[in-house]
Amino acid sequence: MLQLHPSDIKDIVLNGGVIAYPTEAVYGLGCDPDNDTAIQKLLAVKQRPWQKGLILVASDFQQLLAYVDESQLTAEQLEFAFSKWPGPFTFVMPIKAQVSKYLCGEFDSIAVRVSAHAGVQALCRALNKPLVSTSANLAGEDPALTAAEILADFTGKIDALVLGELGEQRQPSTIIDARSGKILRNGQ
């Protein structure tokens, strides 16, 4: 498994690779959100059913516009999300028609976050698009907190490990339904 800095990851991701990378709280697994083969590989590595959907993480909201149907949200709903970003808040938003079922699962919405983590922002800026994000663990297991855990659990299963530090968060992000304002998962 390659161990690289965020700036060196672009070609791996855009060519269908699956990576592990540090986020605000835990290591994440990620891939190109526009590559169904890469998404299916990520789901297989994690042993996660596609029906559950995945999160997209971005460096800014503009990167999410190809996936989120903002026309279904009011100005107030968008302003609420913008007031929490960048930060540890994931919003469930309506999807555009062309979004892959492997991203949204059985839902008519997608979970999105604008990250405050410098490494995640650097990855997304290098890709010029969001990154699929899910915790680096097998379904039902605890997420990886160290590079050593990634190497032990995912060598031979993923293409690269992004070097860097975890953020200060110790809980997963809070998930909020952007349309209703309902908290779906309390984090932080």
UniProtKB/Swiss-Prot annotation:
Segments forming a coiled coil: none
Superkingdom of origin organism: Bacteria
UniProt keyword Nucleus present: no
Reactions catalysed according to its record: L-threonine + hydrogencarbonate + ATP = L-threonylcarbamoyladenylate + diphosphate + H2O
Stored PANTHER family: SUA5, THREONYLCARBAMOYL-AMP SYNTHASE
Family note: Belongs to the SUA5 family. TsaC subfamily.
Protein name per its UniProtKB record: Threonylcarbamoyl-AMP synthase
Source species: Shewanella sp. (strain W3-18-1)
Upper taxonomic lineage: Bacteria, Pseudomonadati, Pseudomonadota, Gammaproteobacteria, Alteromonadales
